[in-house]
Amino acid sequence: MRDPAPAYDGEGRHALWHVSENATIERFDPHVSTTAASSEPRVWAVDTRHLPFYWFPRECPRCMFWAAPNTTSEDADLLAGATRVHAVEDCWLERIRSARVVAYRLPEKCFAPDPEVGGYWLSRESVEPLELVELGDLLGLHAAAAIELRIVSNLWPLWDRVVASTLEFSGIRLHNAESRRDR
């Protein structure tokens, strides 16, 4: 299991969240994700520490990375002094600016930690949210949290460097990234 992402400025108390562009969800029912390794129906949640992974429109491809205890100083240079970096392609910038993204706070008693991925939680039962939070300015959230939002023309060169390094990382919706370019 990967090391958890580092704390961010203004990180609130531990809670579990489901992030969506749909602000009308009244109940989350277990389902089988098309990207999950398991065929068991589940409800997914993310903890507060990893909530910034979802400060994006759902389909936005993104690469997140941070140092781990075993990260070499050479690999840490990819962070360029940041504690945590979230990278997106420039073609998504306007969609990030205009997206309306909400976070549903979920009851922790229904969830258990995902044994495969740190920061993620699973429930086998239907879950009703406790609270709906409008995330607002997604770019501003990154700035306030001191998370570097790195804008690149194509994610693949950076992604390839990160996954070949000793950094910890997460990639979401990478299938939506621009095509790889010839090297």
Identify the meaning behind each predicted range.
Residues M1-P6, G10, R58-R183:
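Conserved NAD+-utilizing ADP-ribose enzyme module
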Residues N22-T24, H50-L51, F111:
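Short, glycine-/Ser/Thr-/acidic-enriched flexible segments
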Residues R42-W66:
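Short, well-structured hydrophobic secondary-structure segments
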Residues E21-A23, A45, E108:
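Short, flexible loop/turn elements at secondary-structure junctions
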